[in-house]
Amino acid sequence: KTRRGYLSATGPRFLFEKYKRKTQYMKQAYRAEILDFINDPVLYGLDAMRHFSDGLLVIEAGKVVAVGDAATLLPLLEVNTPIHDYRPQIIMPGLIDTHIHYPQCEVIASYGTQLLDWLNTYTFPAEGKFSDFKYAQSVAKFFIDELHRNGTTTAMVFASVHPHSVDALCEAAGDMRLIVGKVLMDRNAPHSLCDSAASTYDDNKTLIKRWHGQKRLSYALTPRFAPTSTDAQLQAVQALHHEFPDVHLQTHVAENKEEVAWVAELFPWSRSYLDVYDHYDLLFERALFAHCLYLNDTDRARLGESGAAIAFCPSSNLFLGSGLFDLQAAQKHNIQVGIASDVGGGTSFSILQNLSDAYKVLQLKQQAMPARQGLYLATLGGARALKLDTQIGNFEVGKEADFIVIDPDATPLTAQRMAHATNIDERLFALMMLGDDRHISATYILGEAIYTKPFCTLQT
């Protein structure tokens, strides 16, 4: 603003905004080592990953228009196309977090209990603070910034029970792709955090109409877990699913042995914990179930038949002592699986750190997870789990240009390890095991940099 309070048509702020609007739609090229996945490495082996040691990613109007070897694509660019050179860093699709709680930022790394005690001791008091809309707004901004800083470009998110907690997060999201839902509870929780079957229907219908399909936002019906919902509330969720079949669903299932036993007491007619949701017709393609540690093959077969997906939450499962996920059993039944931080039960926003924990969990199950499989789960695999793989997940032409720049040499330890790696698989495995937010140089949403690490090396 000028001293008179008017925006100067020649001032630096005006010129920057004008440039930003212009460059948002003009063609841009990014040069680096580039990789993405076009299929699941478990099924398609080495052919599932594309790798360009000197690659070029070309973006226009927020979409991918080309990707390939720089030597092939550079001569095809228009003369004035800006080329952003990130060499020797790596460009890959943005990371996808399939399960996270934004109201739990303040209770991450809270000591000493397992799931059910943890909810009562830490989670419910923290979520109670979201009755204050301004507080929800401040946490939402922090949450979005933290996702960007860790290279996460898409997330499926639990809000609190307060409808305005969804509003706060959706307003803070900008152009980020999010799936968000208001938590539903009408029993076995503090009275101040409980709603009713009637309010469940009314509040969710309002939020669906307000946010679902706006910009890059989608809505998810979000019963916290079966023990905190009555029959009437689950019937309301079922009615909403039938009325709005393109809306997602997210919840928890079979995370903890004590929880599983509690569900058997509360729903004595059910065959299993998962069967409770199946009874209310809540197993469908856009449904995602977090944890799934204590399922049997009948449960897994139903998940596979329904098209529902699983969020693998390794950090949270270790921290809360919940158990070990069986990835091979899920794959055997053709269930889509994505990686999830599950903050605040999980102890890091970093999907790279969660991949490191996933590898260790699977080692304890005598199962392997090479880097290609882990990075697939964090990108295209996560997109498939969320039924977003036609929009995001890799660099297929026409997809939305969400990507990150990774510096493998960001710390002395990883630089030392990379110097002794003999091939791409060794380098990616070291990155998966040792990487974290320090290795994220930049995060791009729709081709626009929304986070850049200080001192990030870039030549244009």
Would you name each region that the model predicts?
Residues E106-A136, I179-A197, E255-F284, A309, ...:
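Active-site gating loops and adjacent loop-to-helix segments of metal-dependent hydrolytic enzymes
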